[in-house]
Amino acid sequence: MKIILQYITLFAVVLCCFAACQNDEKESSRHMSKEKLIELNTILVRMDSMYITMYSDTMNLNSHPTPSGLWLTIHDEGNGDLIETGQTVDIAFKISNLKGKTYYTSETEGSRQIVVGKGDIEDGLNETLQMLRPHARATAILIPDKAFGLLGDNNKIRGRQILRYDIEILDVK
C-alpha cells in the first residue's frame, strides 16, 4: 500500500507541474487560469477518493461515499431516533490521519459537547452526527473540504488533510 501511495503522490506532483507549466496564453507564469484551477481541484478530489477507497478496503471498513463526499461506517447502530439539528451531543472521539497519526482524542481532550447544526464544527462531523442515533459507534472519513479545508486547524492538523473520525455517541439532549 505504501508503494501505491508513493506512486499516487508522484503522479499528482507531475500532473500539477504539467498543469502549471502549460501556458497557451501570454499571461504571467504566476497566474493559473480559473479553468486550470478547476482541473487541478478535480484531479485532487479524484486522488482523495482513490486514496480513501484503498484505505477503506485495506482497513475492512466497507465505507462508501455519501453524495457530499463523506465516507461512513456504522459499527453499532445505537438506539432511538436519529440525532437532529439543535440537539446537544456528547461524544467520545479520536481524530487521526489515514496513516494512523492521532491528532486529538477524548482520552486527552475530554469528551466533546456539540450543538448539532451550529457552524462551529467541521461540516463532515455535523453531517455524520445527523446520520447516527444515541449510543452509536461509527468511523467517518472526511475529505479535506468536509474537515479543515486548505488551511488545517492552525494547530496540529495541516491543510488538505483527509481525516478519520472514530466516534461514540455518549449522550444526546
Residue ranges and their predicted role:
Residues I3-Q6, C21-K173:
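Cross-family detector of peptidyl-prolyl cis-trans isomerase
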Residues L5-V13:
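Sec-dependent signal peptide hydrophobic core
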